Structures are given as C-alpha cells and as structure tokens.
Amino acid sequence: MPNLTKKQKEVLDFITQFIQTNSYAPSYREIAEYFGLSSTATVHEHVRSLEDKGLITSSHNAARSLEIVHQEHFSKSI
C-alpha cells in the first residue's frame, strides 16, 4: 500500500465512510465542506493523488463516481 500524507488518508477515510453509510460516493463539494475548504480545487488534487496511487478510481465525466479500489486501505501516513 502506498504511503499517504495525513490529509490524503483523511480524505480516503472520509470517502470510504461516506460510501459505506450512504451507498453512493460523495461529491467534491461534500468533501470540501466536510474539511472546511472553500474550493473544490484542493479536493480535486487529493482525489487525483489517490487515483495516481491506485487507491480510488473515478469517471471524470460522471458525478459521484468515486470508487474505492481496495476496501482495506490501511497505510502509513507520512
């Protein structure tokens, strides 16, 4: 499992918990609101990093398309 920054781990945990609770993925706006961010640009950066590390996938043309690749995402924060 790739190393994650503390914030990446928090975002991944939030997405995972949201999907488990609601049976659908959060929007970028919902992620931003949860973390107190005024812009979704930062969320996009974190999501892209998680995608690059192979932990999530998303269809860039569809809303709420985030999917967890590995349900067991225990990793070391750096």
Task: Kindly give the residue locations of the regions a language model identified.
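Short, cationic-aromatic polyanion-contact patches
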Residues: 5-8, 22, 27, 61-78
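Short, basic interhelical loop/turn and adjoining N-cap
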Residues: 36-42
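A short alpha-helical element within helix-turn-helix/winged-helix DNA-binding domains
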Residues: 26-34
